[in-house]
């Protein structure tokens, strides 16, 4: 089973091993994920489980969303996520909690990175700067040439240039689960995970550790 859970990033701290070694960890709160729909090959063409988490005011829920949540007999959440299933069955209303993971397990964590606004090529793509002297004037942080000549006569798609940096979907792979606190619904994951404090993250079993 390769499903994951939706959590909320609470911030970073550190814990100590019995030998006194300090381990930096990110604390992720795993509110019980409520199953809103179980998709099958017969009805949807593929197997998946759809979940929601958290709460949303009734005034912020559309009629279609309200009907979808009411059909599953679950409270409206702040979003809907879906995980593909290889095996196993779920029913609408089931809860998926932090106990899905165990200490020592490797996981992939997906979140939205912090937005940095408009950034130049040096900050955004780690370009080197131009010469500080030797005749250079007002061109110390410019990217340089962005193309060729009349042929091809255009700038190729994907060219690394200035633009909006951050605020994009990022996945960090193969992070270790240091501790699972089932009573407080917390996961302590070694290292940093994408996004700002309070942001939603998706925690899945590591794809590179499946065999």
Swiss-Prot record:
**Does Cell cycle appear among the keywords?**
no
What does the UniProt keyword field contain? Methylation, Ribonucleoprotein, Ribosomal protein, RNA-binding, rRNA-binding
Where is the PTM N5-methylglutamine found along the chain? 150
- What is known about its processing and modification? Methylated by PrmB.
InterPro entries, alphabetized: Ribosomal_uL3, Ribosomal_uL3_bac/org-type, Ribosomal_uL3_CS, Transl_B-barrel_sf
| Pfam families attached to this UniProt entry | Ribosomal_L3
Where does the source fall among the domains of life? Bacteria
A GO biological process of this protein is: translation
- Summarize the subunit comment: Part of the 50S ribosomal subunit. Forms a cluster with proteins L14 and L19.
By what name is this protein known?
Large ribosomal subunit protein uL3
């Amino acid at each position: 089973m390769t499903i994951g859970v939706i959590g909320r990033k609470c911030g970073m701290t550190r814990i100590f091993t019995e030998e006194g070694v300090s381990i930096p960890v990110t604390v992720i709160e795993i509110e019980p994920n409520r199953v809103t729909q179980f998709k099958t090959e017969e009805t949807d063409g593929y197997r998946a489980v759809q979940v929601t988490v958290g709460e949303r005011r009734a005034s912020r829920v559309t009629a279609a969303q309200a009907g979808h949540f009411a059909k599953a007999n679950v409270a409206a959440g702040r979003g809907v996520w879906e995980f593909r299933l290889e095996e196993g069955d779920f029913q609408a209303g089931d809860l998926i909690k932090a106990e899905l993971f165990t200490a020592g397990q490797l996981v992939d964590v997906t979140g939205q990175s912090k937005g940095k606004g408009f950034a130049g090529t040096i900050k955004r793509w780690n370009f080197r700067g131009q010469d500080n002297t030797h005749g250079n004037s007002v061109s110390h942080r410019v990217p340089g040439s962005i193309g060729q000549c009349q042929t091809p006569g255009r700038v190729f798609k994907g060219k690394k240039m200035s633009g909006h940096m951050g605020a994009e979907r990022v996945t960090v792979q193969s992070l270790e689960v240091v501790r699972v606190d089932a009573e407080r619904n917390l996961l302590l994951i070694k290292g940093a995970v994408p996004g700002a404090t309070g942001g939603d993250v998706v925690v899945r079993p590591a794809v590179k550790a499946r065999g």
